[in-house]
Amino acid sequence: MKELWSPQNRYQKWLEIEILACEAWAELGKIPASAVETIKKKASFDLQRIAEIEEVTKHDVIAFLSCVAESVGDEGKFLHMGLTSYDVVDTALSLLMRDALEIILEALEKLLKLLQEKALAYKDTVMIGRTHGVHAEPITLGLKFALWYCELQRARQRLERAKEVISVGRLSGAVGTYAHIDPYVEAYVCRKLGLKPAKISTQVLQRDRHAEYLNALAVTAASLEKFAVEIRHLQRTEVLEVEESFAQGQKGSSAMPHKRNPITCERLTGLARVVRGNALAALENIALWHERDISHSSVERIIIPDSTTLLHYMIVKFTEILQGLQVYPARMEKNLQLTKGLIFSQRLLLALVEKGLLREEAYALVQRLALQAWPEGDFRDLVKGDPEIGSYLSAAEIDALFDYRPYLENVDYIFWKAGLSDPPVAKWEQKARVRLVSPKRSGEKRELVYEGKAKKVYKTSDPDLYLVEFKDQATAFDGMKKEEIPGKGRLNNLISAYLFALLECAGVATHFVSLVSETEMLVRAVEVLPLEVIVRNLVAGSMAKRLGMPEGRELSRPLVSFCYKSDQLHDPLLTEEEIIALELVTPDQLTALKEISLKCNQVLRTYFQSKGILLVDFKLEFGFDHQGELLLVDEISPDTCRLWDLETGEKLDKDRFRRDLGDLISGYQKVWQRMQGGEG
């Protein structure tokens, strides 16, 4: 970073821009090609000579140009043709700011990787969570690291956005009108430098870009400060749950030999204040006079190199802090006991409400004992000795409330949402099974509103609910191949219901309400979108045929594509641009469809793999209910998924029927049996 912001590198960027501008003029026939070759061969500069000239001119760009012209000779007259100083200075500054962010982002990637490792390492290390500085309820140290990981992912997105915003150049003259320069010169130079030409400018690029950049740096620095402050609090003598490493020979105080202070975290806290202050200065730079004044220049010469250098330093130092961080689980356990059971007060409150007390009554009862426990003794003992609570809860029920484990049941789910682990499908399976055997909701089957190849849909007595009946008919090739296969409807209904319930545990909204029978389910009424979403993990089916590739080739990442639902047109593929142009969905809805589909893929792929099944690809359908909520609809079954045995590669899906690979039901039955815990 120091080299990046050196005068040598800055002037080198200026020279590069001047030479590229000459090349562009030569292509336009305004400068002899031989002159450009001479300039490229001879052009150089000397820092001391530039400083000498600037002493006289009081203008750094003129001093630079004079120095370069001296090295070139007569051909130096073509340098800076049609340009103004900030055509060069601003474009070069954009390059430097872009390159600085690349250095910062590289360091940030290392920190993110380390945070991921720390989060997983301490995922189950229980400690007390604190609100307002006061003990609240149990969490884990890994959750803190996971929180920081997600926050820095957002920081990375902001910094990437800032890099995009600042990766812009301008060579448009004194007031941005190209009065003495051809726009081609700007386009040529920017293309060679990997920048985009500004859509419009004055004598300078507009400073909202630089302000956004500095604010992205400041927010990132503030996040690092937040993490450092947390470590400082956790290192306080009264807490001492973590500690900065303390090197051999290091001293903490000139007067007190025992001191081990969190000095690096304190340093980061202070530096973040500097970066924040610089961001404010960048905001002040936005309001320039007319087509430009120079008030921003002196500010930027300080705040931009300083802020990028400081943030890079902060990231590197915080990475070192994490690498050497001392963690004390025994102290965490001791601190959990400090409040003598008060941290379980909410569990007691909810248990009393479940037993029939009004919430306000239960709250007052628990609070009375909690306030008594602070000065007097053990909260659990007070609870057990209270006759009113004893009339609702037994001693065993009370003891069960004073347990850390329920607070941590969803840590795996949080880690999955944070992108730190696979979805915890094993924990969701029991919930999904409960959904399948929960009390059936029913609506009187009334008018048949739709019959397709695989299902019938009926209105019910409730206008917001439909009843879906799964048929035994199997079809392929747009109905050219048909067969009644007893038991197919039952298996597709049960498998779909189970997978809908599983996905709902992962936060995916579906139309599924409940099973009505082994071949029927109750669903929410929706307006179905005319799109099918296809998610592929491996090359297979139509993709293999279209590309002439063998089936089974794994894709480097899941591929999402879309089809227009039309039997007559054989469900043609649609590009995302076509979907938006045809207004089939809005851009935001399209983004949501992709995100939900990829989420489904992550859950289903992990789930099926745990059952010895490979999820090759699958199709999904979506719709909106009357409240405008986007729901996953239709079915998720071997009819709509390609499912292969993980070890043998045996196809367990509808391809058995399409390609005459064996009995359809036996394949579907294997899938259902494995989902139920059998070998299949």
Give the label of every model feature segment:
Residues 1-13, 53-58, 74, 256-436:
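Glycine-rich cofactor/substrate-binding loops
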Residues 1-172, 178, 182-188, 197, ...:
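A helix-coil-helix interface module used to build multimeric assemblies
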Residues 155, 159, 203-296, 301:
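Glycine-rich anion/phosphate-binding loop at the beta-strand->alpha-helix junction
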Residues 553, 636-680:
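C-terminal helix-cap and adjacent tail motif
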Residues 585-616:
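A long amphipathic alpha-helix within ATP-dependent nucleotide-binding catalytic cores
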